[in-house]
Amino acid sequence: MNAYQKTIGRAVTLSGVGVHGGAPASARLLPADADTGILFQRSDIKDSAPVCAHVSQIGATDLCTSLGAREARIDTVEHLMAAISALGIDNLVVEIEGPEVPILDGTSARFIEAVDSVGVVTQDAKRRFIRILKTVRVEAGNSWGEFRPYDGTRFEVEIDFECPLIGRQKFAHDVDEETFRKELSTARTFGFMKDVERLWAAGLALGASLDNSLVIGDDNSIVNADGLRFKDEFVRHKTLDAVGDLALAGLPFIGCFSSYRGGHRLNSEAVKALLSDETAFEIIEA
């Protein structure tokens, strides 16, 4: 457990396209002072106010997690937030050119590479953590998510798809920087070929491609020539998403998060439920 807050050594920029709008997008990561937190700002909108990376600022959870509202909304923050969280970075300003964080390769790997290229700086301020004191659970139909006390940071994510290629998969592991790098960071976002036309008609997935998505064909086979990176790559990516979504609690947590058939909305509702119950957690200093 890192005792002191961290930021990055210098600014670094990543460019690509937005997975939903398909337009060019870039993210410039800049160092920030201790106790700043993670701030997002639309650099393409004059005088736009920074938005705190916090569950209270979530604007939408349809296929991705969005922060802010109206014309200054920033979509698809989860892969970047997962990398930031896993690397133990507490303070950062993220300038976004366009309405989306670039999808890059559909994972957190490129964000980690960018941070590695500029280094991490330890700051003269202690880290704070959310320690889970009791179980908090949310349900939606046959899906659920819950926090419970645990001496560490653990994710137990289970998915269950009708598609036989995916089926029922579970990832259960304590997640620290090393685990995230090795087991989760390269797991790709995924989708079904049968959904493509519907998504396009809705103005979504316009930037999706085999370069940034794992695609399941109509015959339930992998369309990508390189196949799966892990036999359970699907649940690993869902866990990556959960790491990013839960980072919007505003502080790293000590406890276990479990979910069944979860997603961005359920993840965010679980965080909101936790933070709304002051008896369910305490804030501690490292």
Swiss-Prot record:
Iron is among the record's keywords: no
EC number: 3.5.1.108
Lineage: Bacteria, Pseudomonadati, Pseudomonadota, Alphaproteobacteria, Hyphomicrobiales
UniProt keyword list: Hydrolase, Lipid A biosynthesis, Lipid biosynthesis, Lipid metabolism, Metal-binding, Zinc
Metabolic or biological pathway: Glycolipid biosynthesis; lipid IV(A) biosynthesis; lipid IV(A) from (3R)-3-hydroxytetradecanoyl-[acyl-carrier-protein] and UDP-N-acetyl-alpha-D-glucosamine: step 2/6
Record-level GO BP terms: lipid A biosynthetic process
Cofactor names: Zn(2+)
A molecular-function term among this protein's GO annotations: UDP-3-O-acyl-N-acetylglucosamine deacetylase activity
Catalytic-site annotation from UniProt: 264
GO cellular component: membrane
Task performed by this protein: Catalyzes the hydrolysis of UDP-3-O-myristoyl-N-acetylglucosamine to form UDP-3-O-myristoylglucosamine and acetate, the committed step in lipid A biosynthesis.
Enzyme category, top tier: hydrolase
Record: residues binding Zn(2+): 79, 237, 241
Superkingdom assignment: Bacteria
Keyword Membrane set for record: no
Parts of the chain that traverse the membrane: none
Family (UniProt): Belongs to the LpxC family.
Protein name, as recorded: UDP-3-O-acyl-N-acetylglucosamine deacetylase
Catalytic activity: a UDP-3-O-[(3R)-3-hydroxyacyl]-N-acetyl-alpha-D-glucosamine + H2O = a UDP-3-O-[(3R)-3-hydroxyacyl]-alpha-D-glucosamine + acetate
Gene that encodes it: lpxC
